[in-house]
Amino acid sequence: MKLLTANFLNCSNKKCTSSPEAFPLDVVDAKLAIQQLELKPEFLIGIMPRIDWNALLKTTRQLGNYSLPDEKPDLVDDSDEVLLKSLHNVLLETEITEGKMVCGNCGHVYPIFEGIPNMLLSESEI
């Protein structure tokens, strides 16, 4: 699962939909892989408005990556090549292959196996 995907996932439990603690999910016991991909500045510029920067920072720091700036950058063109490469590496090349995502509100654990998060809840948790 790419970190870009993790930036859009939250707890599926109805009790958690209105809780700010349910997003982002905490990433624990993660195994990471880096997959080299072609840099596409236009994609990064287009996706940046949809990125929850604070959630992304929390996730990357839980994974030991401190390469992103504290403040969300204004990415309006491809002139900042260093920033583009850093975002590309974090959002698109870094993958969580194994691990868990944990809801900070209800504590539900979503396992990640072979890069795929299991976001299903049992009937009693819905």
Curated annotation (Swiss-Prot):
Organism in which the protein naturally occurs: Schizosaccharomyces pombe (strain 972 / ATCC 24843) (Fission yeast)
The protein's name: Multifunctional methyltransferase subunit trm112
Cellular compartments per GO CC: cytoplasm; cytosol; eRF1 methyltransferase complex; nucleus; tRNA (m2G10) methyltransferase complex
Domain TRM112: residue ranges: 2-122
PANTHER family to which the protein is assigned, alphabetical: MULTIFUNCTIONAL METHYLTRANSFERASE SUBUNIT TRM112-LIKE PROTEIN (PTHR12773:SF0), UPF0315 PROTEIN-RELATED (PTHR12773)
GO molecular function: protein heterodimerization activity; tRNA methyltransferase activator activity
Keywords assigned: Cytoplasm, Nucleus
Main location: cytoplasm
Family: Belongs to the TRM112 family.
Gene transcribed to yield this protein: trm112
Record-level GO BP terms: maturation of LSU-rRNA; maturation of SSU-rRNA; positive regulation of rRNA processing; regulation of cytoplasmic translation; tRNA methylation
Gene3D superfamilies: 2.20.25.10
Role, per record: Acts as an activator of both rRNA/tRNA and protein methyltransferases. Together with methyltransferase mtq2, required for the methylation of eRF1 on 'Gln-182'. Together with methyltransferase trm11, required for the formation of 2-methylguanosine at position 10 (m2G10) in tRNA. Together with methyltransferase bud23, required for the formation of a 7-methylguanine in 18S rRNA. Involved in biogenesis of both 40S and 60S ribosomal subunits.
Family annotation (InterPro entries): Trm112, Trm112-like
Pfam assignment, any one: Trm112p
Record note on quaternary structure: Heterodimer of mtq2-trm112, forming the eRF1 methyltransferase. Trm112 is necessary for the solubility and activity of the catalytic subunit mtq2. Interacts with trm11; required for full tRNA methyltransferase activity. Interacts with bud23; required for full rRNA methyltransferase activity. Interacts with rcm1, nop2, trm9 and lys9.
Location of the protein in the cell: Cytoplasm; Nucleus
